[in-house]
């Protein structure tokens, strides 16, 4: 697959978005709804280099063409709790197959932990789905974004208790679903 479809996915992600999500906290048997407004903007080459440096990741020769974005969001839960965050992210493709790209997803700030982090990604062009897997200290988050059209995305989040090294993911602690609409 060519990287142009991958780039188009990210071009479609740029803009102002609004999302309604439902989170199922399985360990507490609680369900929570939230509303998030977020903005996705491309980042400069200097910010791409900063994300690489923050993660002690080697600079690839084609850094200027890597998909890199600034994400800014504010979430309000149905309980009135507010969370705001900003971060920069970069996607470095390492393998290409006929309908898939995969590689590393770097952030200068993780969602679950206050530190830079390197995760894995896999992009399926036939489904227009970006699957990101992040290994945190206590959990592993598997986050899916499926682009239905340039103004509608479906989000699915599965968070697992981190298993012992070599064991499969099995103990789900959080399930999240979201509908994300651009320009609302």
For every predicted segment, state its role.
Residues 3-4:
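Short, Gly/Pro- and small/polar-rich lid/capping loops
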Residues 7-10, 14-184:
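Soluble ligand-binding/transfer domains with enclosed cavities or grooves
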């Amino acid at each position: 697959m060519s990287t142009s479809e991958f780039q188009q996915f990210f071009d479609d992600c740029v803009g102002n978005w609004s999302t309604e999500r439902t989170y199922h906290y399985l360990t507490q048997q609680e369900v929570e709804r939230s509303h998030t407004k977020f903005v996705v903007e491309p980042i400069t080459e200097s910010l791409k280099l900063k994300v690489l440096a923050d993660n002690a990741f080697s600079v690839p020769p084609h850094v200027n063409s890597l998909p890199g974005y600034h994400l800014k969001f504010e979430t309000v839960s149905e309980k009135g709790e507010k969370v705001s965050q900003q971060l920069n992210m970069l996607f470095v493709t390492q393998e290409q197959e006929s309908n898939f790209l995969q590689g590393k997803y770097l952030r200068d700030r993780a969602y679950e932990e206050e530190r830079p982090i390197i995760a894995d990604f896999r992009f399926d062009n036939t489904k227009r789905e970006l699957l990101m897997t992040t290994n945190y200290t206590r959990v592993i988050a598997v986050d899916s974004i499926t682009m239905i059209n340039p103004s509608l995305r479906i989000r699915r989040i599965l968070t697992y208790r981190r298993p012992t090294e070599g064991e499969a993911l099995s103990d789900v602690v959080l399930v999240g679903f979201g509908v994300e609409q651009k320009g609302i």
